[in-house]
Amino acid sequence: MRLEISSPQTKLPYPKTEELPFTLQELRNAIPADCFEPSVVRSLGYFFLDVGLIAGFYALAAYLDSWFFYPIFWLIQGTLFWSLFVVGHDCGHGSFSKSKTLNNWIGHLSHTPILVPYHGWRISHRTHHANTGNIDTDESWYPVSEQKYNQMAWYEKLLRFYLPLIAYPIYLFRRSPNRQGSHFMPGSPLFRPGEKAAVLTSTFALAAFVGFLGFLTWQFGWLFLLKFYVAPYLVFVVWLDLVTFLHHTEDNIPWYRGDDWYFLKGALSTIDRDYGFINPIHHDIGTHVAHHIFSNMPHYKLRRATEAIKPILGEYYRYSDEPIWQAFFKSYWACHFVPNQGSGVYYQSPSNGGYQKKP
């Protein structure tokens, strides 16, 4: 369904059917073949652009050394950290290049400086893509049942539902509600036995970078660390949580259980969103529907692919141009849990008087 949301009150139905009227192969056939071909030169160009901008703003902030400029610097630098994360995200999907070695190198260079364990995150993100829209097996921003919601400890509810924009660092250590494991430990249930060495590689790389930050703090003090790293990092965390939350949290998105779920149906349970002038800065990550259907497609080919599949998707395509913060707070209040049973169910919250299925 194409959502053209102009106000928080807009409610549009979702055409729920047992089977979608198109197949994954039909969608793939509609997309130009070159959309699946990454360009190493172009991909590296985005990586070096982000790194160059980050280095440039570090130099500018150090040169000015002004508390009037620092808040601006934090917003810009944190946003650029987020952009660099998206480059590493492409590496994790294998859409940066066809070389696994290059993908892993650039992935580590992109993610380690922003405290993301590349392989640990890559693997859990793979699980998310393989199970999107499945209440029981999705990895990120999935709903809990009303029963589990009522059983959650107060601090779990606080973090998941009232402080969601700072949840990511804790997720790396503890995953999401009702899931066990850590992104840093090779023995975590997240990982297969053959993935342990890769997970350890990323964990050691991140530990080395934390040691480097400790050395800088020892040399220049805590205020230096706060000004030049912690504050931009927190902005990055907000961006990551905000964007991923909005891609998968909306009171008109159905969630599935059991045999009623399958990959394509789940992949369509996400939304394209418009971030305005930020779109090119964070590499069009808001073009999310096509990405979930074909995650091996480079980010710079997603807009073209989206236009190619929209005629086939028809009302199954979701797009929102609702202002980002308005969309966030609408879902923030409306989306807390789903019914204990059933499939094709929708988010509800304690404040809306109980479960009422959308028309």
Swiss-Prot record:
Query: Where is this protein localized, as stated in its record?
Result: Membrane
Identify the metabolic or biological route this protein is part of: Lipid metabolism; polyunsaturated fatty acid biosynthesis
Short sequence motif named Histidine box-3, residue ranges: 291-295
UniProt keyword terms in alphabetical order? Fatty acid biosynthesis, Fatty acid metabolism, Iron, Lipid biosynthesis, Lipid metabolism, Membrane, Oxidoreductase, Transmembrane, Transmembrane helix
> What switches on its expression?
The level of transcripts is negligible in the dark-grown cells and is enhanced about 10-fold by exposure of the cells to light. Low basic levels of the gene transcripts increase rapidly upon exposure to low temperature and decrease again to low levels in cells shifted back to high temperature. Expression in cells grown at 22 degrees Celsius is 10 times higher than expression in cells grown at 34 degrees Celsius. The induction of expression is completely blocked in the presence of rifampicin, chloramphenicol and 3-(3,4-dichlorophenyl)-1,1-dimethylurea (DCMU).
Q: Where are the transmembrane segments?
A: 44-64, 67-87, 153-173, 206-226, 228-248
Q: According to the UniProt entry, what is the EC number of this protein?
A: 1.14.19.36
Q: Which reaction does it catalyse?
A: a 1-[(9Z,12Z)-octadecdienoyl]-2-acyl-glycerolipid + 2 reduced [2Fe-2S]-[ferredoxin] + O2 + 2 H(+) = a 1-[(9Z,12Z,15Z)-octadectrienoyl]-2-acyl-glycerolipid + 2 oxidized [2Fe-2S]-[ferredoxin] + 2 H2O; a 1-[(6Z,9Z,12Z)-octadectrienoyl]-2-acyl-glycerolipid + 2 reduced [2Fe-2S]-[ferredoxin] + O2 + 2 H(+) = a 1-[(6Z,9Z,12Z,15Z)-octadectetraenoyl]-2-acyl-glycerolipid + 2 oxidized [2Fe-2S]-[ferredoxin] + 2 H2O
Look up and give the membrane topology term: Multi-pass membrane protein
Could you tell me one molecular function GO term of this UniProt entry? oxidoreductase activity
Q: Where is this motif: Histidine box-1?
A: 89-93
Q: Where is this motif: Histidine box-2?
A: 125-129
Pfam families in UniProt: FA_desaturase
Cofactor dependence: Fe(2+)
Q: What happens when the gene is disrupted?
A: The disruption mutant loses the ability to desaturate fatty acids at the carbon 15 position.
* A cellular-component GO term for this protein: membrane
Q: Which InterPro entries match?
A: FA_desaturase_dom, Fatty_acid_desaturase
The record ties this protein, via CDD domains, to:
Delta12-FADS-like (cd03507)
The keyword Lipid metabolism belongs to this UniProt entry's keyword annotation: yes
Question: Organism's domain of life?
Answer: Bacteria
Record-level GO BP terms: unsaturated fatty acid biosynthetic process
Question: What is the stated purpose of this protein?
Answer: Desaturase involved in fatty acid biosynthesis. Introduces a double bond at carbon 15 of linoleoyl and gamma-linolenoyl groups attached to the sn-1 position of the glycerol moiety of membrane glycerolipids.
The UniProt similarity line reads: Belongs to the fatty acid desaturase type 2 family.
Q: What is this protein called?
A: sn-1 acyl-lipid omega-3 desaturase (ferredoxin)
Q: What species does this protein belong to?
A: Synechocystis sp. (strain ATCC 27184 / PCC 6803 / Kazusa)
